[in-house]
């Protein structure tokens, strides 16, 4: 690889590391139900929510369905995993299958990144409920239960579909103590 290409890659890497929005818009692909694999073009409200996530460690988003917020959380999780070593992300949802969908979205985005973004952070563990990179960062999925997240030190906690979790107060009391 010549020095000019290396320079461009280095500059792009720095831009991606500095901005999750830039990273997602430029390099993350998502699965659209009708169009298949497409580039993740964030809507303006998704950009605002992303800023909210970065500026407020405890964010609760009341929203309607099908706004792409789970996909946004997946992209944000992947950005954290790639550019911040040793981060532990936990996704709790009503059912394990729902939580697994978050990990699946992260994996899809990861698998479709250009090789230069993946070469330093290859998967060290990859199964249906976990993706751990060799930089120590990982995302794990679990179902909502009173002991969800116990014995974890969590950098980012995602509670997906929280309105549908029966014992959300008990789960929150348990899970919030895991936040590092």
Q: Where do the model's predicted regions map?
A:
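Phosphate/NTP-binding elements of NTP-utilizing enzymes
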Residues: 2-180
């Amino acid at each position: 690889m010549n020095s000019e290409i290396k320079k461009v890659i280095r500059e792009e890497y720095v831009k991606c590391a500095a901005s999750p929005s830039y990273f997602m818009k430029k390099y993350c692909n998502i699965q659209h139900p009708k169009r298949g694999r497409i580039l993740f073009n964030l809507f303006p409200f998704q950009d605002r929510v992303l800023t909210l996530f970065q500026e407020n460690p405890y964010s609760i988003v009341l929203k309607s369905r099908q706004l792409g917020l789970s996909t946004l959380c997946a992209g944000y999780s992947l950005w954290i995993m790639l550019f911040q070593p040793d981060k532990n992300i936990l996704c709790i949802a009503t059912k394990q299958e729902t939580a697994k969908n978050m990990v699946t979205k992260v994996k899809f985005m990861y698998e479709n990144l250009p090789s230069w973004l993946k070469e330093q952070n290859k998967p060290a563990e990859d199964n249906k409920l976990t993706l751990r990179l060799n930089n120590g960062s990982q995302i794990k999925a679990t179902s909502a239960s009173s002991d969800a997240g116990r014995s974890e030190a969590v950098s980012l906690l995602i509670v997906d579909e929280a309105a549908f979790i029966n014992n959300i107060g008990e789960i929150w009391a348990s899970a919030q103590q895991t936040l590092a």
